[in-house]
Amino acid sequence: MAESPTNSIVREDQTATLVELLRTRATKQADDLAYTFLIDGKKEGVSVTYSQLDGLARAIAAFLQKSQVKGERALLLYPQGVEVVAAFCGCLYAGVIAIPVPPPESGRMKRTLPRLRSIVKDARASIVLTTERILETIANVQDQFPEFETMEWIDTDKIDYQLGEKWQDPQIDKEAIAYLQYTSGSTSTPKGVMLTHGNLVFHCGNLKKACGYEDNSVTVTWMPYFHDYGLVEGLMVPLYNGTPCYIMSPFAFVKRPLRWLQSISKYRATHSQAPNFAYDLSVRKIKPKQLETFDLSCWEAAGNAAEPINPKVMEKFNETFAPAGFRWNTFAPAYGLAEATLLVSTKPKLTEPVIGYFDSQALERDKIVAVSKDGEGVRAIASCGQLVCETQVAIVNPDTKERCAPDQVGEIWVSDPSVTQGYWERPDATEESFNAYITGTNEGPFLRTGDLGFLQEGELYINGRIKDLIIIHGTNHYPQDIEWTVQQLHPELRPDYGAAFSILVKGEEKLVVVQEIERRAKDIDPEAMLPEIKQAIAEEHELQVHALVLAKPGNILKTSSGKIQRRACKASFLAGELGVIADWSENPQITAKFRDLEGEVESLAASLKNNK
């Protein structure tokens, strides 16, 4: 392994672009380890120093510069690894706008290609940087997508490394767009967030301070490069900080979750991040004897973000892995979004996480009433920490756009230099989301996050998405709470694979719950589970279920970061497209009736369009 990094001699705060930063690292820390890929999350594969990464980036950039494509958009289609980091940096070195996207999966083309195609259309991308294997996968379906045939497909493994000698500085500044981060689309069609070099450099500096990165920090990451959490904190912050990063594939993590923790132990990682489900999965997969095989006492910041944080999962993980050296204060719950580059808030390193306890009925009325932990009707919410550096947050009524009282839940509005320019070629959406002002004041502009939450004693709490909120009889219900209630009833109900949403029935909102059953479930009676689930929801949430579906695995869609796509699940339910194992409804013909209703609406829309 390379010697200890000498990153203290690099002034990151004096660099305007990622190009300047990496060029400086390549000069001052030429032989220091930058990235190592772990094959199957275990065996060391490709490693690069900063000098080698700079050489790869210059070669890729010089190849692109031959075609004079500065300002063009390039898709990055790669498996997780060092290659995609080099391609990302190569785009920046050429002044090409990078677009990290999930690579198509040969066994799931129908599910993965439509989103890729929509991104190509939206960004008007003309270049694809990829590998030979992915080129072969695409070749089988390329004739079905005319957009792909007009693009230049480049296998970066075949680019001559010596070409880097012909690289020319792209002459860009901090205002240049570095990449487009396509939002995960949990509640809407994905949009390309425009992130400048200035956004990225500034925010990496903020994360270095807020998350406690030091000269001896080490990162282990399996978060996908095409997700903002994986790209910014997983891959770019180590580059900014000048410290080593060990990269795992997300597939390796899902297949063998404990290799993530074993890698943290082996490489003495101080920083590693994951969504809530990863901590839950690790608890469910660990066996007592395995705890003896690793030491987690090195871990200083266990980032927890990208999906709702469940305090019970945090407590269970801490209880399970404390014998392996994990500490409660290692947890670092956080909140963020691509539109703010990444994090809005996080818990400072090695401070105690804060769990708030609130009256659940008051929260349903958007009121904040703190209560004791042991009372009845209590909802525990994990704080997402304190605001990052210069970040300012306002809690605002999403309808009136007035600032909420301190004891009210509202929409989270953000102001910070890390807030991005807006959405690629979407001026209306940009105006709506990025240029909000508080009614009756000159306060603004703010970024509207679409998330509900509140501030209490300097801690930011998240309550869910506005568009996911279930409102029945004037009372607010959070889908993640209902889903959690269901999934605790039986081990064969898949954790994190349920969706609660409402549908309109005769002018009234009604509750629908869809829950997947484990693939290897045996000796269960799904029909017998239905009344048990209905009763639990009635007791815990005082809600009557209108329709309940126990579905086969693969019916609950998730975003690239693991968020439940409740609107997609609702659409599948209404279209009668769910793979049903068992179901119940107040109206046995509900699916067919809603299909008919959708057909009527589509016919009416077509009629109105034709009569314009």
How should these model regions be labeled?
Residues 15, 496-497, 503-504, 509, ...:
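AMP-binding/adenylate-forming catalytic domain of the ANL superfamily
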Residues 21-48, 178-180, 187, 336, ...:
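AMP-dependent adenylate-forming
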Residues 34-86, 106-114, 166-171, 192-198:
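Conserved AMP-binding/adenylate-forming core of the ANL superfamily
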Residues 201-218, 228-270, 285-290:
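Conserved AMP-binding/adenylation subdomain of ANL enzymes
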Residues 262-265, 272, 416, 421-422, ...:
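AMP-binding/adenylate-forming catalytic core of the ANL superfamily
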Residues 269-273, 285-377, 392, 400-402:
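Gly/Ser/Thr-rich phosphate-binding loop
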Residues 381-407, 411-472, 598-600:
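Conserved ATP-binding/catalytic segment of the ANL
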